[in-house]
Amino acid sequence: NRSMESTCLLADHRRMVERGNVLLDYLRGAETAVVEFTTGDICEFDLRFRQAGADNGYLHADKQGEAFINLPSGEVWIVPYEGEIPGEKSRTEGVIPVYGDDGQIARFVVNENRVVKVEGEDQLTIDLREELALDPARRNVGEIAFGYNEAAVVSGLFIEDEKAGFHWGYGRSEFLGGTVGPESFRHPDTVLHRDLPYAKDCPITVSVALRYPSGKVCLLYTSPSPRDAIPS
C-alpha cells in the first residue's frame, strides 16, 4: 500500500530497535498484563511461562534467528499462557470489547485464556459467534502485542494499525511462541489467527499495567499508544 511510504515505512529502524528493547525489558518477568479498555471493560492476560518477541525492523548479517522481517515493523508481542501444563490453569480472564465498522460493540467473555461467550444483541455479535463456532481452537487467546512505530497511523490497513498501538489476537499461536497450531484445529479450512487493533485513533483504546511476582506494578502506558510512553 503506497500510503505507508509516507508514514510507517519512514520510521527510524535504529530507534525502533532501541525502543523495542525497552518494551522487552518491561515484559521480561512480568506475570500479568492488566488491560483496561476505554469502554470500562478489563481483561487480565496471564504472561507466565512465556517470552516476548520483537519485530523491530533489524535485518543485518548478525541478526539472530530467521533472516526476515515484517514491513512495516515495530511491535513487541507475547502469547498468553494457554494452560498446557498439567494442573496449571491459565489465569487469563476478563471481558474484551470488539467494535464493528458501524459502531456496534460485542464483548468477548474470557476464562482460562479462552473466549467462552460473546455478549451483545446486534449483527456483529451474531457474526462473531458464528466465526468462533466453526472451530473450538479459534477461542484461544493467542497474542497480545504492543506496536511502537512512531510513524504509524491508524488508516484501516491492519498491518499498519497494529504497529500504532495495542492489539490482541485469537486462534492460532504457535508461530508466535504459543502451543495452538494448525493441528489443533478441526480442519485446514478453519485454521485462523485474527488480530484486533486498539491503537490511537481506534474507536476503543486501552491502558496497560504489568504485574510482577514481587508485587511490583508497572504502568506501561495510559495514553492511547505505547509510543508515547516508551523512553526515547
Locate the predicted segments by residue:
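Dual-mode signal for accessory low-complexity, basic/Gly-rich regions
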Residues: 91, 117-179
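Metallocofactor- and cofactor-centric catalytic cores in central/energy metabolism, strongly enriched
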Residues: 95-107, 112, 117
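Short acidic-glycine loop/turn motifs at beta-strand connectors
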Residues: 39-40, 110-115, 119-120, 212-214
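Conserved, well-structured core segments that form the ligand-binding/active-site neighborhood
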Residues: 1-85
